[in-house]
């Protein structure tokens, strides 16, 4: 009887869908391209399967502005949650990835919603509330140290490398 129980337990491990569910949270930067019309940017990618219910997750979020770059230099402008295309994500720097719980995933999704501007609101600030501040908040929610020094607020890759150094438990290397 004991052998049968062990055999069935081993068999369950091999069946499809019996793998441990997990969602990963990855932090990305884009170097920017004046020819391509994109400025430096930082965003997150959530990927995997939730433990509760087995829902598949494949999402990404960044914080940007719908106003032009010159407007953003002058002060507060409308902010938007920006979702990137797969082709764009493939061209970015993946700085580090960590596994998060279902509860952390739910909290991060709530934070994404909280960053959405209501119609008529202007909360995006190039120096005080930009893509770096957005993912810094999410990094903190995931248990990372992620302060934003003023000299890094417009330099996503530099800032994510800084966060990499502050969090050696990630086992990540700086992106060159």
Set out the residue ranges of the language-model regions.
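Sec/Tat signal peptide C-region and signal peptidase I cleavage site
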Residues: 15-22
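A structural motif
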Residues: 99-112
């Amino acid at each position: 009887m004991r052998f049968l129980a062990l055999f069935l337990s081993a068999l369950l491990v091999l069946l499809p869908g019996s793998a441990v569910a997990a969602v990963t949270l990855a932090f990305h930067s884009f170097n920017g391209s004046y020819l391509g019309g994109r400025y430096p940017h930082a965003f997150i990618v959530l990927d995997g399967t939730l433990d509760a219910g087995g829902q598949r997750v494949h999402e990404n979020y960044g914080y940007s502005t719908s106003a032009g770059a010159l407007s953003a230099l002058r002060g507060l402008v409308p902010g938007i949650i920006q979702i990137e295309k797969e082709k764009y994500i493939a061209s970015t720097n993946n700085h580090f990835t960590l596994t998060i719980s279902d509860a952390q995933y739910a909290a991060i999704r709530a934070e994404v919603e909280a960053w959405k501007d209501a119609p008529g609101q202007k909360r995006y600030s190039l120096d005080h509330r930009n893509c770096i501040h957005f993912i810094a908040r999410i990094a903190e929610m995931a248990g990372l140290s992620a302060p934003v020094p003023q000299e890094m607020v417009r330099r996503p890759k530099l800032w994510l490398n800084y966060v990499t150094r502050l969090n050696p438990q990630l086992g990540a290397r700086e992106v060159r």
